[in-house]
Amino acid sequence: GLAVQHVKSQLASDPQAEAAIESLGKYAKQARHCLAIGDSKKLGLLMNRSQTILSKLGVSHPTLDLFANLSLSNGALGAKLTGGGMGGCLISLTPDKPSAEKIATVLEKHGAIHTWIEPLVTLNRKGDHHDHS
């Protein structure tokens, strides 16, 4: 897609882009571990770091950046784009359902078309699902 093409062109012209991509990979592995052990605070931090990199790589969108900042300023532990990039969808990690509801309302007031609230589900080392709602 468009985001992949954009990143490929940056990799060819910007030596720091490769390090940024490597950081995203490292954060993804750490995020998986956070999900496995239920460390939502560190997961949120990793989401924020990833969003900063994605924005610098130019695959975010100003509206998604705004929504991420609004999420964080209204209680989210982390927020980052998801999907193919270049706009569209944001995930905000909140400590509880009331925080999620507050953030959904704020985002809708700022133009979000749809919001969904889903509990965080993680896997333990045996592969059993755990609902953290």
Language-model regions: role of each:
Residues 1-79, 91-133:
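C-terminal nucleotide
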Residues 87:
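Glycine-rich active-site/cofactor-binding loop and its immediate structural neighborhood
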